[in-house]
Amino acid sequence: MMKRSSRLRRAACACAVITAVVLGVCSPAAAASPATAGAYCVMDAQTGEVICQKNAYTRMEMASTTKVMTALVALENAPLSLTVRITRAEAGTEGSSMYLRAGDVYTLEDLLLGMTLVSGNDAALAVARTVAGSEASFVRLMNEKAQEIGMCDTHFDNPHGLHSQQHYTSAYDLALLCGYAMQNAEFCRIVSCKSAGIKELTSGETRVMVNKNRFIYAFEGADGIKI
């Protein structure tokens, strides 16, 4: 297992358990306000130095921030032009949704947009199955990537973040992951979108989806990622 001191990287994230990620350093105004999150970790963008933290190494549920890894693994293993046909099981996924319908066909890029902008659990499952052949195989890739990055307090059990006792991370590990992911140009472009047109290829129907991450509207320089 890697020592925590060696896990510091060129990352830049302010992370909480139900996490808002903002690249850069805390402003004086933000530093003066008491943090109410149960856990957070703020890293310097260039040095990987932990500027401030609270319970940064405590294992907690990661919820929809799971999709940061889902998007990263998909981008590293498949082209954005890959077409995905939605199954009945995926269309009925519980929780936050793109409201996909069985038989619909989308590009991987549009599913990644829906997954990050509106946190579609249905899209996450469809992406996982198509990229790796099965959800289990995709989750294996997620855990392998976590080990590569140095996420020592993280284990993935699904690609969407619904509750599982075997699905957890820490604020520090999320900071590592987000800093790593933002080095991927396509990932950075997708998560920083304020809105996007999502096209179903069979019918040609296009829906506009708006990013639910209020940080990108409220703070100059915020690059998005997940809340």
State each model region's role:
Residues 2-15:
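Bacterial N-terminal signal peptides that target proteins for export
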Residues 21-29:
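C-terminal segment of classical bacterial N-terminal signal peptides
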Residues 30-53:
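A short, well-structured edge-of-sheet supersecondary motif
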Residues 35, 134-227:
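Penicillin-recognizing serine hydrolase domain
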Residues 48, 61-85, 174:
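Active-site SXXK
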Residues 59-68, 102-109, 117-121, 132-140, ...:
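Soluble non-cytosolic domains of exported or imported proteins
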Residues 76-90, 185-194:
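Short, well-structured active-site flanking segments
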Residues 94-126, 206-227:
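Conserved catalytic neighborhood of penicillin-recognizing serine enzymes
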